[in-house]
């Protein structure tokens, strides 16, 4: 699946807004059965459904919003001192694999640390994986960016 990762690149630290590297597990699956484009805030559905008109309204009001849509796979680090515990804990950083607006370009860094996917892709992945399954986030071959694909 093509994905989008952090605008700030890779990194482990809280507040960095970077995508963490290394071995993780799926801590929780959130949104099972929710309609495509359902909006989540703090891992809870708001009851809203994303549309370009809603996004435009937010823009006109001068508001910005990081749209977390459709499904959430909440990640937890497995490597103490690397992505688990302390100031580098992936779970406490609220790093997810989640859906985003269909207009969002994949394979271009743009998130605040999460891994964004197309909504239909995140539903497909969500249905294929179980809580506790491993996720390995690695650099691409040129070692300058996170690989912008997920293989299930």
State what each model feature region is.
Residues 2-18, 54-59:
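N-terminal post-signal-peptidase region of extra-cytosolic proteins
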Residues 20-21, 131:
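Short, flexible surface segments
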Residues 36-152:
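Exported/periplasmic cell-wall-interacting domains
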Residues 17-20, 67:
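Generic alpha-helical scaffold signal
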Residues 1-7, 88, 95:
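Histidine- and aromatic-enriched segments that form or immediately flank copper-ligand environments
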């Amino acid at each position: 699946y093509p994905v989008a990762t952090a605008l700030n690149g890779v990194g482990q630290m809280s507040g960095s807004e970077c995508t963490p590297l290394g071995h993780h597990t799926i801590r929780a699956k959130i949104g099972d059965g929710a309609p495509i484009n359902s909006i989540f805030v703090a891992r809870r559905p708001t009851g809203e459904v994303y549309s370009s008109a809603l996004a435009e309204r937010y823009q006109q009001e001068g508001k910005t919003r990081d749209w977390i849509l459709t499904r959430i796979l909440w990640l937890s680090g497995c490597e103490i001192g690397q992505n688990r515990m302390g100031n580098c804990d992936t779970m406490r950083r609220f790093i997810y694999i989640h859906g985003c607006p269909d207009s969002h370009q994949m394979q271009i860094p743009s998130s605040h640390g999460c891994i964004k996917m197309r909504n239909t892709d995140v539903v497909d992945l969500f249905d294929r994986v179980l809580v506790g399954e491993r996720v390995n986030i690695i650099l691409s071959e040129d070692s300058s960016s996170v690989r912008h694909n997920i293989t299930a």
